[in-house]
Amino acid sequence: MSDAAEAILDAAGRNVIAVGFHATTVDAVARDAGVSRATVYRVFPGGRADILDGFLAREVERFFSDLYDHVRDLNDLEAVLVEGLTYARSRIIAHPVLNVALVEDSSVLESTFSKTIESITATIAEFVTSYLPTSPHRAERGDFLARMALSYLSAPGAWDFADPAQVEALVRSELIPSVSSGKRVSKVRPRPLPKAENTTLQQRVARALQKEFVSGGSLSMESVARSAEVSRATLYRAIPGGRWQLVGATVEIETARILSAVAAGLNDARSLDDAVVGSLTTIWHHAATHPALTRLLAVRPDLIHDQMRFAKAQRNFEVFTAQMAPLLARWVGREASERVAEWTLRVMFSYWLDPAPSLDVTDPASVASFYNRHLAAGVDALAALPDQRRVAAVLGKRH
């Protein structure tokens, strides 16, 4: 990278820290870097967007390089994962730029991550795989660990990464459980979606929008209102905002239908293993075959990816876990049910948004086999964890 480019990116960093991403301008960056606007546009033809992309890409590269330097001399995988996750989370929180992005608007990181996440995942997978024993699924396991590690760095969920005991429990249960379960859970058929209703205005709008969206229509407010047989004014009152707000509302309705199908499966499950396998099978099947969701992932993947990273992912994990966990509590305690539900959702989103050659999310047999290889032992370990909130309550009463 040229000296001019480095100076411009350094200036961009100072501006971001001072005024935030949205208030950073080309003029301010040029003035801070001591160069002309013409020089800025010669080095970064795309202007502000290129500058911020280049700056964030550099910061992300430096972040992971620093993380690698911190763990590369450790001798075993558990130490690598515990120390690496703890250090990385603390660095994200303390990082003057990444923290600004997370607080202000994590969507500014989406372009950078969409361009670099594949190479970052592959690099982490290669590193952790070197610690794994030789086995038929060694590379696949390394990829799984890399995916999970990046997911925790983005959104820790219910795990407190400032508590060393919790990080160790996470690693020993979800990532490298000490004892293989030896179980072979059978495949579970996906549950059908409940019938799509048209009794409310929101449901009619959702049906109309899906029709327009899937068919490749203009997706204008006029066409959606016409298809839903309502006026534009009524449409705006029901779902304020533009067309992508309509898409978001439709996704929420369809997500609720998928969760209803999951709940039906959980009610009929005979064991915790059946419950998790059935939930993954049902969610993956509908997420991968639903016409509106598949088209949205094809034309605006950023809208979905952005919801599954950083603060937005944290919020979504909390919402979805709160809906799923109570249905798992008949097998395990409340805290364990929340851990299992969150992990199930974390795995589901990772392999739906970034498919792996080792898993066909639409094939129940493939899902069950994946569960047996990567999740069964971890679910057992999570179920065996003590309920820390209950322990704390008991200790509090004693004192």
Feature locations, PLM:
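N-terminal intrinsically disordered/low-complexity leader segments
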Residues: 1-3, 107, 159, 169-200, ...
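Alpha-helical structural segments
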Residues: 3, 7-14, 18, 32, ...
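Short coil turns linking two alpha-helices in DNA-binding domains
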Residues: 4, 36-37, 231-232
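HTH DNA-binding helix-turn interface
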Residues: 18-21, 41-52, 213-218, 236-247
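Append "Primarily bacterial transcriptional regulators
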Residues: 28-32, 40, 223-227, 235
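Amphipathic alpha-helical packing segments from all-alpha helical-bundle domains
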Residues: 64, 108-143, 304-342
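Amphipathic alpha-helical segments used for helix-helix packing
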Residues: 89-115, 286-313
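Amphipathic C-terminal alpha-helical segment
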Residues: 90-94, 130, 145-162, 173-182, ...
